[in-house]
Amino acid sequence: MFNLLLDFDGTLFDTESGHEAAYLETFAHFNLGPCPSYESLKGIKTREVFDRYQSIHYNTDEMAQYKSSAYQAGLSAVKAFVDLNLLNQLRVKGVGLYIVTGGSRKSIEGLLNLHQAKDLFNGIVCAEDYYRSKPDPEPFLHCIRQYAVTGEIHGVEDSVQGIQSVRAARLRAIGVHNSEVEKLADAYYPSINTYLSELIER
């Protein structure tokens, strides 16, 4: 059995601008000071980001909910990086497809439903399902345990934290879309679709 454990934001869907705008709006609304670069926040749970800014005036849940609502407002504008037809071909060939993300289940399933893509995946692991964020291996290890994934497993990621998480889980790390991860990954593809096409043909 061959399996792909796929990151979501920046790997399957072009969500970066939406998340970045939502973080900027939230930091401004709560007067939290300069917002960190989105690159440094990739793969980290939203709650963990705002844990650092909790105060007597605002709590983590309040800030995380505001950010989530700001992101949800622009969900319909998010485009797919991945060719969903390629994922469907892999599924037909018997490849196991799993999402492993630091995003909330509401955001992930909302976007998948908009693209009628939820049924392509054998399982989805979201921020609510584990304790330690990427670069810790827990998100990927949790997916393997939760869905009893066996056989050859590749982890596909676009961020440094994500690739580190895959490697810490002792999986083959496939980097996509971000040249910063090329030196860390076992293999790198500028487009996830090139990688998926290779898998279909092999």
Q: For each predicted feature, which ranges?
A:
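Intrinsically disordered, low-complexity segments enriched in small/polar residues
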Residues: L6, A21, P36, S69, ...
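Substrate-recognition element of Asp-dependent hydrolases with the DxDx(T/V) motif
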Residues: N85-N113, V166
